[in-house]
Amino acid sequence: MATALASKLSKGRSLLGGLCNAFSGLMNSSSNGMMNGSILSQQQHRTFIQMGTILKCVDNSCAKEVMCIQSLRGKKGARLGDIIVGSVKEANPIVQKKVKKDAIPKGKVKKGMVVYGVVVRAAMPKGRADGSQVKFDDNAIVVVGIKEKKGQNNSHGSKRKMEYNQPTGTRVFGPVPHEMRLRKQLKILSLAQHIV
């Protein structure tokens, strides 16, 4: 009887603690003034990467912005290290003249193409084993494959199996979390400027 009562008491404390934290966060945000409108817009920023989310492309594959079409994770949205299918909404113009050794390859990805990408930065906090959390200011991906049109085969006549561990670009800009190592994305880690 005493153990059942103790477990119910601990559950009640954890629920009450979470409620108090949410309420204090609500009071702090309202007392500081509304920066970008309502509290709901701030809460929306911390959700999964789902269909319709605009992501920044942080490699040099000529894509600037990609809109998520589908998460290959399943019903839930994508998190750090997950693979998504996206449509390129904005792309860099193709560089015609060669200026030294530029970071931008000649037009691998164009606007309107459907690409596969690995989520390398997410605005939603992700807990780590040591108790800390990693959270980024933006949602970003690295392009790892370009979806071919239906019926398009490679030179051998058989359909090519898509490899999701080789990035299309040759550089990755900005920080990348070390959780990519657990997702077997070692090539992205080796190309990254900073590992967090």
UniProtKB/Swiss-Prot annotation:
Biological process, per Gene Ontology: embryo sac development; integument development; plant ovule development; response to brassinosteroid; translation
Induction data: By brassinosteroid (BR), repressed by the BR biosynthesis inhibitor brassinazole (BRZ).
Organism this protein belongs to: Arabidopsis thaliana
UniProt name for this protein: Large ribosomal subunit protein uL14my
Physiological role: Binds to 23S rRNA in mitochondrion. Required for the formation of the proximal region of the ovule primordium during floral organogenesis, thus participating in patterning and growth of ovule. Also regulates the initiation and/or maintenance of integument and embryo sac ontogenesis. Prevents inappropriate cell death in the young ovule.
Keyword Ribonucleoprotein among record annotations: yes
Disruption outcome: Female-sterility due to abnormal gynoecium and ovule growth and development with highly reduced integuments and collapsed cells in the distal regions of the ovule primordia. Slight reduction in the rate of growth and size of the pistil.
HAMAP family named among the record's database cross-references: Ribosomal_uL14 (MF_01367)
Record keywords, A-Z: Mitochondrion, Ribonucleoprotein, Ribosomal protein, RNA-binding, rRNA-binding, Transit peptide
Any single Pfam family the record assigns to this protein: Ribosomal_L14
Origin organism lineage: Eukaryota, Viridiplantae, Streptophyta, Embryophyta, Tracheophyta
Location (main, coarse): mitochondrion
GO cellular component, one term: ribonucleoprotein complex
Cell compartment(s), UniProt: Mitochondrion
Signal peptide range in chain numbering: none
Tissue expression summary: Mostly expressed in pistils and inflorescences, including floral organs and meristems, and, to a lower extent, in leaves.
Organelle targeting sequence: 1-62
Stretches the record annotates as Disordered: 148-175
Keyword Transit peptide: yes
